[in-house]
Amino acid sequence: MYSIKMRSSNQDVHISGAETICEFDKIEQTVQRFYNKGFFHENGQPDFLNIKIQKIMEPIQQIKALQIIEDDKANLQHLTQECGVTEQALNQGMTYIKNETVYTGAIILSAISGKRLDSFGQRGIRATHFSFEDMNNKGDLNERVTDALAIASCINAHPYVKGELCVSDDLTYTTGYFASAKIGYHRLFDIKPVNTRYGGRIIFVDDRIDLNHYISFLESTPKQVVYETV
């Protein structure tokens, strides 16, 4: 198995990213797909694109995908409150999402105080070394949803994670999500105005979390997210 990652940017501003884990015979088509995504993206044409291919030498940890909850009227405040995220922490998370800084990874905040707990600056924390396996083989999930669900499932695979809020920084995509192990994966429609680049990924955690161990799991442990509906 091989890990394939793509990142593209323009003048050091993030444009697009993608990754997966695949067999050797799928490398060529995956690289072509990531190349197309990186170079022909609505956020603009990059002046830098990097594709990294690395053989997986460790056992791959299987993670059960979060359940997708279909609720057109999902309310972010109610969802976060149900998961133990305070209003103060949510407001601080939205401040990071709406500021002008384009973060390339997630920001980890205390679910109680909203204080930032990681020290990775604009880089943030990156959930990497993962793939998504749809056991249903129905093809009913598009690439955007499978990528989001895979990341959300990895991020929430820890008992001290209260939940994750994600708002895409793509110009015309205005749907975000809130996800947690407790309540599943909820899409949030019209969470931002169209034609805006603001966005981000916020992870709300219990202050007792072993941050170094958690970050190592997200960034270094090979993971396969398995999606299967009943």
Curated annotation (Swiss-Prot):
It catalyses: heptanedioate + ATP + CoA = 6-carboxyhexanoyl-CoA + AMP + diphosphate. InterPro entries: BioW. Its cofactor is Mg(2+). Pfam families: BioW. Its EC number is 6.2.1.14. GO terms for molecular function: 6-carboxyhexanoate-CoA ligase activity; ATP binding; magnesium ion binding. The keyword Ligase applies. Pathway: Metabolic intermediate metabolism; pimeloyl-CoA biosynthesis; pimeloyl-CoA from pimelate: step 1/1. GO terms for biological process: biotin biosynthetic process. Keywords: ATP-binding, Biotin biosynthesis, Ligase, Magnesium, Nucleotide-binding. Catalyzes the transformation of pimelate into pimeloyl-CoA with concomitant hydrolysis of ATP to AMP. Homodimer. Belongs to the BioW family. This is 6-carboxyhexanoate--CoA ligase. It comes from Staphylococcus aureus (strain bovine RF122 / ET3-1).
